[in-house]
């Protein structure tokens, strides 16, 4: 008889492929937007602003706490499209990333709020908008780009701090998605702002691999998701 695994959310299905199967593991999927999933064996009060939690929704016998950012990579893409340098998007990203890497945190004295597409956490309001402050006649395009990078990293920090406020242990942070794999400057900035090391597995298709692991568990090829992850 063929075995059929139940349907599952795309971000959840990637977790075993990335080795995110244990309590205290936080996964972040970073693309145009961002989602963060934290596993915890213990049921805890949901911190105000965190979007939700469900039991055994991602990994059996574990609570999965979920929160996200409405804009992440698409905020940087907006800047590149609004203020192009060469007409080649890839080259423009490379230029601004290199230039931003040479600046220290807050060096341009420009601050950004990353709500270009509304705010998921902590307010859950799609009508809210982003902002830039601190600009003057000396402000450069790189200052603005760097501020936008900092803003999405601090948005992620807001989520991590809220999750930790419930008492949930966060022992490791595992990231996936195009930005995690391709933008080393942004990942270093995120590590600095979170104050922790980041694990970035070099998997090209973690969602597909995770789906295969789910199928293997359903078919009895492996005993559980931990074995599949190994």
Where are these regions (language model features)?
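Active-site core segments that coordinate phosphate-bearing ligands/cofactors
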Residues: 1-230
